């Protein structure tokens, strides 16, 4: 599991506990008013800069923590809820959510970008906890635990600390002397000793993992045509229990395939090729159903940012060629190539993959053709040499005479 340095760790917010106690949601003003009985934290879903925000869900629970005598921390009283009145909250991301780029965001948000500017973005959702029904008996520090439920889905890497520790600092009101909330601090880990490193955060970091799938066409042999189009069908096969995008979720498609052609192919009509190839994105529904595409030698199709762990099948319509399939990532245990069926299959896409379909068409040139051409050619050559010899001899005789 990768481990990154928090992009906002060096920011001043992490040097000041009170500021860290008030997370900043995307687009929020630094001076915004916050209800002292409420605590807001963020959910950051990091992904490739070209990926569409997936419709993936995450679930959180708020519960009283345990007392830490060494730090004078008390267990939080019951009653803390999310603003919908429940102790468990599920959120679902969508393409309409706020997105911040890794080279232009409020660094007070502790987003776990990889540090390479321009290649990542994060969708941001805010969650709010309500302490208005909590009875804090005395001034002090009260601890709660925020926990994120995790799964084994390959498409999502969860926060390395699925439990965060929320300390609520309670003081006495200057007028009534009643206990009131002064501030709140969210800790990355459970701090139980005064000497431990204390990292303050503004929320949870998860990563949406994606990979590119590409396939390309090549031909070989002395009878192979480099201008001929070959028909392919690419189909996505989701694994049981794995993350599955919405049918309308779209994937960017790049590469070098002809989106339109001007004339009929030897096998396929211009209308057929143009109807199949004229696209720059494909929806999840199209890929589940299977999408036809036509490629000729030297062309490649790339489907970008498929969710990691998803399966696929690419099949080439067989013709009077001998197909051979090769993949550039041989470590992928789920990949199989059936040359007889001209089909490449993978039960789980786990890295960027390029599959090469090579069709061979060759054969021996008939020897009778060679003999028929070679005999007259040899006779012509003999005649030519004879003429040259006679001319040279005559010239020599004339010179001597």
Label the model's feature ranges.
Residues 2-401:
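Solvent-exposed loop/turn and edge beta-strand elements of beta-rich ligand-binding domains
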């Amino acid at each position: 599991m990768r481990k990154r340095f928090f992009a906002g760790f060096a920011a001043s917010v992490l040097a000041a506990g009170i500021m860290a106690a008030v997370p900043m949601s995307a687009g929020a003003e630094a001076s915004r008013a916050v209800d002292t009985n409420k605590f807001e934290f963020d959910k950051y879903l990091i992904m490739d800069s070209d990926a569409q925000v997936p419709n993936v869900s995450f679930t959180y629970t708020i519960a009283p923590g345990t007392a830490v005598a060494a730090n004078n921390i008390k267990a939080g009283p019951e009653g803390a809820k999310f603003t919908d009145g429940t102790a468990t909250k599920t959120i679902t991301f969508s393409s309409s959510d706020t997105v911040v780029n890794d080279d232009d965001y409020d660094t007070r948000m502790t987003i776990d970008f990889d540090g390479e500017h321009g290649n990542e973005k994060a969708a941001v959702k805010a969650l709010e906890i309500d302490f208005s029904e909590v009875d804090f008996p005395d001034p002090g520090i009260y601890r709660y635990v925020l926990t994120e439920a995790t799964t084994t889905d390959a498409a999502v890497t969860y926060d390395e600390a699925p439990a965060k520790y929320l300390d609520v600092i309670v003081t006495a009101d200057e007028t009534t002397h009643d206990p009131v909330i002064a501030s709140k601090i969210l800790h990355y880990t459970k701090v139980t000793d005064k000497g431990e490193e204390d990292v303050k955060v503004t929320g949870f970091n998860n990563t949406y993992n994606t990979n590119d799938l590409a396939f390309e066409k090549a031909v070989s042999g002395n009878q192979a045509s480099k201008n001929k189009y070959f028909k392919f069908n690419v189909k996505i096969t989701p694994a049981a229990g794995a993350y599955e995008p919405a049918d309308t979720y779209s994937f960017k498609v790049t590469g070098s395939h002809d989106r339109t052609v001007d004339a009929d192919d030897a096998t396929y009509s211009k209308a057929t090729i143009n109807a199949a190839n004229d696209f720059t994105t494909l929806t999840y529904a199209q890929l589940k159903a299977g999408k036809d595409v036509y490629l000729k030698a030297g062309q490649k199709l790339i489907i970008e940012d498929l969710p990691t762990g998803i399966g696929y099948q690419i099949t080439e319509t067989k013709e009077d060629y001998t197909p051979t399939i090769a993949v550039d990532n041989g470590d992928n245990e789920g990949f199989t190539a059936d040359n007889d069926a001209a089909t490449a299959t993978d039960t789980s896409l786990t890295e960027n993959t390029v599959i090469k379909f090579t069709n061979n068409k060759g054969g021996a040139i008939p020897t009778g053709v060679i003999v028929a051409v070679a005999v007259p050619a040899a006779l012509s050559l003999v005649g030519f040499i004879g003429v040259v010899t006679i001319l040279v001899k005559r010239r020599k005789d004339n010179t001597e005479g």
